[in-house]
Swiss-Prot record:
Expressed in which tissues: Expressed by the venom gland.
Name of the protein in question: Eumenine mastoparan-ER
Species annotation: Eumenes rubrofemoratus (Solitary wasp)
Family: Belongs to the MCD family. Mastoparan subfamily.
Task performed by this protein: Linear cationic alpha-helical peptide with antimicrobial activities against both Gram-positive and Gram-negative strains and against the yeast C.albicans. Shows moderate mast cell degranulation and leishmanicidal activities. Has a very low hemolytic activity. Its mast cell degranulation activity may be related to the activation of G-protein coupled receptors in mast cells as well as interaction with other proteins located in cell endosomal membranes in the mast cells.
One of the GO biological process terms: defense response to bacterium
Keyword terms: Amidation, Antibiotic, Antimicrobial, Cytolysis, Fungicide, G-protein coupled receptor impairing toxin, Immunity, Innate immunity, Mast cell degranulation, Membrane, Secreted, Target cell membrane, Target membrane, Toxin
GO molecular function: toxin activity
Length: 14
């Protein structure tokens, strides 16, 4: 599970 990848995806969606 890519935690950093998920965070970056959410940050980019904001």
């Amino acid at each position: 599970f890519d935690i950093m990848g998920l965070i970056k995806k959410v940050a980019g969606a904001l």
